[in-house]
């Protein structure tokens, strides 16, 4: 039997000692957690293991011995290591040995009890698998440590080999913390053995941050209570608070600080990641704000900005005056209503004159305003950007007024024209029913309405032109403010901590693998297929998992096959038989369908037409075009593999569904055919000729672009290698090619059908 031993990479170079870990009998694997070094007192070791078992609910024990020497272990050391098995009895007893500076490992697993079967070896083969203990513990590959009783039982029963490793390492944190600050009576080596000084500093920082966070949380709660006072909810203050971007950003930053200095512990890793991202975002914001503050107060840049701000405002006002004078003439050669054009132009020019006077009155205070705005950058760059957005809104307030005037005037014109157009057509708007109804008007009403409609229609181009110009100016200001708000939102929501982990430590963002989740009650648990030979001295990637990690394409293919099986109903007049022994509740629909893979050659007609099969789909497998077909229930008869399937090669028509002149004789020689029954039904056979305790399989051979594999493909193991097949009795070997044109080296392609699932 092959045993799997998961060994931490942090213990590869440690001194000799005992292997402390957990034995998983369901997976025949041992998870090594730490190395216990000499010298030690056995009673203290047993007390430590008992405390760890009680705190973590993990069966931690001494699994074996670890020998790390400069050369082969001496005879006395070997006898001493063997004698430790009597002090710490465990079955099996692991013995791992490595030469210092070498790459050769010696791995043994012995049983002190007598072998159960005669001739069985007393030692098992060991497959050594290295894992990074720190990465496994810091990642989210393990299951939650706190689960309800009902979920904990189901989770423990469904965990596979890798999930058991993740769960064991995660729940054994008590063992890793036993010697964080000092070595103690027992000296262990694990992932935290070399970080005692860092652990002490981290513990001191954690204890010092508790009172500080409590004090800051109290101050923030006081500020929140003051801001929620009813005085700030009165009309002027509430209106200004909802319109100013600075107030919104300060409120948002207060929520962030409350979350950061909260003394409540994070319930799950998602909340912890959110809190860490918030801390990183606030630190980045404050750092950028301090950089802006130092830049503004250096070399009297605030005075230069104040001196340049008033001339810029005057220049903008002059450009607006030139634009209005251009509109009061003949803009772009358009004929405007001169009276209305002059009224609107002078109205807007008067507002610009008022705005220039207001700017000149505020010019002595601009430098002081900018100085206080620069001080606000110590709260963060986002606060300074929000203040800049509010300043832009105040400096362009006249443009906003122009846009509102033009929009209201244009809206009145449009509504008036729509009402007069309904009057002109003899219609009216019914306010109660919210619809347009017919209405009879007098002659004077029609005359006045038609006259007003004509006047408004001729005045519409002038109003529309002013509305269009001021709308474009307003859009320009809104675009600038939108860019500023976009930058503020980017700084507030930037997951800087997650990005740093993704670049530096991507294992911290890993989640539980979906392949290790339960597949359902009707499906067997995933199994690991291991090569029969020993893996000592071989690289770990040679241990090929079978059935535990399926590709996405295989998962989708299995889902499609299950959907097709679900649409196959039992035939009329037959009752559903009871479950046969060894089939694990095999469904009736699966017993009513037989699947096969057939080739589609380039120079002829495929053989599935001759056999009357229903094509399900086609795909490319191993560089060979293949089609998946279904044989209906009336074709499901007792079958056996034969080298030929048609009389063109076999000399007799043993299969009535294959014609005499097969269009593709070479392909027919590659197919395991279905033969009519030649014996009566006996006990142990289902009504459709499926032998109980066996799995259905059809093999197809054909050319392969890669190197031909061994006689038995690793994806088609025998019943002894794959216990989930329900007791497979038939040996799935490639069928001989038979006569016909020569083909390249045959390559076995198998479709295996197990109870409750279909696996390629």
From Swiss-Prot:
Gene Ontology CC: endoplasmic reticulum; endoplasmic reticulum membrane; glycosylphosphatidylinositol-N-acetylglucosaminyltransferase (GPI-GnT) complex
Keyword match Membrane: yes
Pathway assigned to this chain's UniProt record: Glycolipid biosynthesis; glycosylphosphatidylinositol-anchor biosynthesis
Annotated transmembrane regions: 278-298, 349-371, 378-400, 446-468, 475-497
The keyword Hydrolase is assigned to this record: no
One Pfam match: Gpi1
Keywords assigned: Disease variant, Epilepsy, GPI-anchor biosynthesis, Membrane, Transmembrane, Transmembrane helix
Topology in the lipid bilayer: Multi-pass membrane protein
GO terms under biological process: carbohydrate metabolic process; GPI anchor biosynthetic process
GO MF, one example: phosphatidylinositol N-acetylglucosaminyltransferase activity
Segments for region (Disordered): 696-748
Compartment(s) of residence: Membrane
Membership in a protein family: Belongs to the PIGQ family.
PANTHER family: PHOSPHATIDYLINOSITOL N-ACETYLGLUCOSAMINYLTRANSFERASE SUBUNIT Q, PHOSPHATIDYLINOSITOL N-ACETYLGLUCOSAMINYLTRANSFERASE SUBUNIT Q-RELATED
The protein's role, per its UniProt record: Part of the glycosylphosphatidylinositol-N-acetylglucosaminyltransferase (GPI-GnT) complex that catalyzes the transfer of N-acetylglucosamine from UDP-N-acetylglucosamine to phosphatidylinositol and participates in the first step of GPI biosynthesis.
Disease in which the protein is involved: Multiple congenital anomalies-hypotonia-seizures syndrome 4: An autosomal recessive syndrome characterized by onset of refractory seizures in the first months of life. Additional clinical features include severe global developmental delay, dysmorphic facial features, and skeletal, renal and ophthalmic anomalies. At the cellular level, the disorder is caused by a defect in the synthesis of glycosylphosphatidylinositol (GPI).
Subunit structure: Component of the glycosylphosphatidylinositol-N-acetylglucosaminyltransferase (GPI-GnT) complex composed at least by PIGA, PIGC, PIGH, PIGP, PIGQ, PIGY and DPM2. Interacts with PIGA, PIGH and PIGC.
Protein name: Phosphatidylinositol N-acetylglucosaminyltransferase subunit Q
Organism: Homo sapiens
């Amino acid at each position: 039997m092959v045993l799997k031993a998961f060994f931490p990479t942090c213990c590869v170079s440690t001194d000799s000692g005992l292997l402390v870990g957990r034995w998983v009998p369901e997976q025949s694997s041992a998870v090594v957690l730490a190395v216990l070094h000499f010298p030690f007192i056995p009673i203290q070791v047993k007390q430590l293991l008992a405390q760890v078992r009680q705190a973590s609910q993990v069966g931690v024990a001494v699994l074996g011995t670890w020998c790390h020497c400069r050369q082969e272990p001496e005879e006395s050391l070997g006898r001493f290591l063997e004698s430790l098995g009597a002090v710490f009895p465990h079955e099996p007893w692991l013995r791992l040995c490595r030469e210092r500076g070498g790459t050769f490992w010696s791995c043994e697993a012995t049983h002190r009890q007598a072998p159960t079967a005669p001739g069985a070896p007393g030692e098992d083969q060991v497959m050594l698998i290295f894992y990074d203990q720190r990465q496994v513990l810091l990642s989210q590959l393990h299951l939650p440590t706190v689960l309800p009783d009902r979920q904990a039982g189901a989770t423990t029963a469904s965990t596979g080999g890798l999930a058991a490793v993740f769960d064991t390492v995660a729940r054994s944190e008590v063992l890793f913390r036993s010697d964080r600050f000092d070595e103690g009576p027992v000296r262990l080596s694990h992932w935290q053995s070399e970080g005692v000084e860092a652990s002490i500093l981290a513990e001191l920082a954690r204890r010092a941050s508790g009172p500080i966070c409590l004090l800051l949380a109290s101050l923030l709660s006081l500020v929140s209570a003051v801001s929620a006072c009813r005085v700030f909810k009165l009309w002027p203050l509430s209106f200004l608070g909802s319109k100013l971007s600075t107030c919104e950003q300060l409120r948002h930053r207060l929520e962030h600080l409350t979350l950061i200095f909260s003394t409540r512990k994070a319930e799950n890793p998602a909340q912890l990641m959110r809190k860490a991202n918030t801390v990183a975002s606030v630190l980045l914001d404050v750092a950028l704000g301090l950089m802006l503050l130092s830049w503004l107060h250096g070399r009297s840049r605030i005075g230069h900005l104040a001196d340049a701000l008033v001339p810029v405002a005057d220049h903008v006002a002059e450009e607006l005056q030139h634009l209005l004078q251009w509109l009061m003439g003949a803009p772009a050669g358009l004929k405007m209503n001169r009276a209305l054009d002059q009224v609107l132009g002078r109205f807007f020019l008067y507002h610009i004159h008022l705005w220039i006077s207001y700017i000149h009155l505020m010019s002595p205070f601009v430098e002081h305003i900018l100085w206080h705005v620069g001080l606000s950058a110590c709260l963060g760059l986002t606060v300074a950007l929000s203040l800049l957005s509010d300043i832009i809104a105040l400096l362009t307030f006249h443009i906003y007024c122009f846009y509102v005037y033009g929009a209201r005037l244009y809206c009145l014109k449009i509504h008036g024209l729509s009402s007069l157009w309904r009057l002109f057509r003899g219609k009216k708007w019914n306010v109660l029913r919210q619809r347009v109804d017919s209405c009879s008007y007098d002659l004077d009403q029609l005359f006045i309405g038609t006259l007003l409609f004509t006047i408004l229609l001729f005045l519409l181009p002038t109003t529309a032109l002013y509305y269009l110009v001021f709308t474009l100016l307003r859009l320009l200001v809104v675009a600038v403010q939108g860019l500023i708000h976009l930058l503020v939102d980017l700084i507030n929501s930037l997951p800087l901590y997650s990005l740093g982990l993704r670049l530096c430590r991507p294992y911290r963002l890993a989640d539980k693998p979906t392949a290790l989740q339960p597949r359902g009650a009707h499906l067997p648990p995933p199994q690991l297929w291991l090569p029969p030979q020993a893996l000592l001295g071989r690289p770990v990637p040679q241990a090929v998992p079978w059935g535990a990690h399926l590709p996405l394409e295989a998962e989708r293919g299995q889902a499609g096959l299950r959907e097709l099986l679900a649409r196959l109903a039992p035939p009329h007049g037959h009752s559903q038989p009871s479950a046969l022994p060894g089939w694990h509740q095999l469904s009736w629909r699966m017993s009513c369908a037989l699947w096969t893979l057939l080739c589609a050659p380039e120079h002829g007609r495929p053989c599935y037409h001759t056999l009357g099969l229903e094509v399900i789909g086609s795909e490319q497998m191993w560089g060979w075009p293949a089609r998946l077909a279904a044989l209906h229930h009336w074709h499901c008869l007792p079958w056996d593999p034969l080298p030929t399937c048609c009389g063109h090669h076999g000399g007799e028509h043993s299969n009535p569904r294959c014609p005499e002149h097969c269009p593709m004789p070479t392909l027919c020689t590659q197919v395991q055919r279905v033969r009519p029954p030649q014996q009566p039904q006996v006990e142990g056979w289902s009504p459709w000729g499926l032998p109980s305790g066996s799995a259905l399989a059809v093999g197809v051979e054909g050319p392969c672009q890669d190197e031909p594999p061994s006689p038995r493909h690793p994806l088609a193991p025998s019943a002894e290698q794959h216990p989930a097949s329900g007791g497979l009795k038939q040996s799935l070997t490639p069928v001989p090619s038979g006569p016909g044109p020569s083909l390249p080296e045959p390559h076995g392609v198998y479709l295996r059908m197990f109870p409750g699932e279909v696996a390629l």
